Amino acid sequence: NNVKRSLRLLLIPLLILISPQAEPSSAQTPQLTSVKATKAHAIISLRLETGKQVFLDKSLSEPRGQACANCHQPEYAFADPRTVSPGAVSERAGTRNAPSLLYAALIPSFAYEDFLTPEGAEVYAHEGGLFWDGRARDLFEQVQQPFFNHKEMNLSSESELAHRLRRSSYSQKLKELVGARDWADDGLVTYHAYLCLVELLRSPVFRPFNSKFDAYRRGDQAILNEQELRGMKVYIEKGKCDDCHPLSATNWDPPLLSDFGFDNLGVPSSGKPDLGLGKHTGNPEEIGKFRSPSLRNVALTAPYMHNGSLKTLKEVVEFYNLRDTPHGRWKTTDFPNTVNRTDLGNLQLSQKEMDDLIAFLHCFTDRHLNTNASHESLNIDPEHAESNHAQSLLFPGWTHRLHRGFKAQKSDN
């Protein structure tokens, strides 16, 4: 983790220049007055509005009735309060808890990287990617999969999705993006729908950075009370939370509160054993490992862990503290051979320290969600287009994809 942080700190000066919290200046926010920039903003604005409509559209499932918003509800930080989410077919349900979509656009692309440990040893590890097992390299891959998963929206093909998009109330907006010449091309119709969803998830609505913790980092030292400050100390030191959910800006500024690495925490079994990352990579040493989530808005996203087996923040903290002690009360875990026995399980936190830590975890809640937790929180501000355009090169790798309709030159790289 320390090596990850030191490498990523090289990026922070550039990130700060376009951070949502950075003070505007002529150097940081040049006036994009060219015709090309104006056109780009218009396209992004149209994508944002269309992406919102796709996100809320219940006609894009079979049978109809299931939308992205069914499993990613604004009042729960765009997560799902149910252990697993029912699909379009009522007797089918997913096997994992639906994660929050907030800050998902900033999760680094799935990669296998080498790191140096503090002792100087070179190790290799997977990090990043979307879904609990990282199987989607980036957000563009992720937004496609739920449409065709038989436990989710249950469409049979891209042709079926394209047909429904052409019959939607927002079809003319989508057609404007696709172009009249290509409107009959199913692949291009769905391609642009995916881009619209990604553009929505990149917008400031999904990366507000306006929690009490953010205000504290910006210099409002009085905003945290004594218990929350004690909780921050527990978080960094005795609780070891900072090891995997660093408070420092290691991969984005403001921090995302995750290193996005993979670990087997030994969570209680729930249903069929889930291979996690190991199924995706085929590596037996990675069986049962899942990606570390961001802790932003964690107080709103219960239940917890990949299988929703821990129901409250209190239970999560108790699990980390007591898992390997005689006081542990949790079921057998699926894959004990790959469980992390070093960093959690017997933290020896007192009840007061656990209470303080929970109080601090509530400081990660974006404050607008406390007052505007509904579909109205998907309101798109025209300035979002400029924000998305200005930051486009710093979002993870999907932005550099070739258009599906282009013929790529073969590369030796």
Regions found by a protein language model. Name each.
Residues 2-54, 145, 150, 154-229, ...:
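Post-cleavage N-terminal segment of exported redox proteins
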Residues 29-142, 210-332, 373-413:
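Short glycine/threonine-rich turn/loop motifs
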Residues 332-341:
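Charge-dense polyanion-binding interfaces
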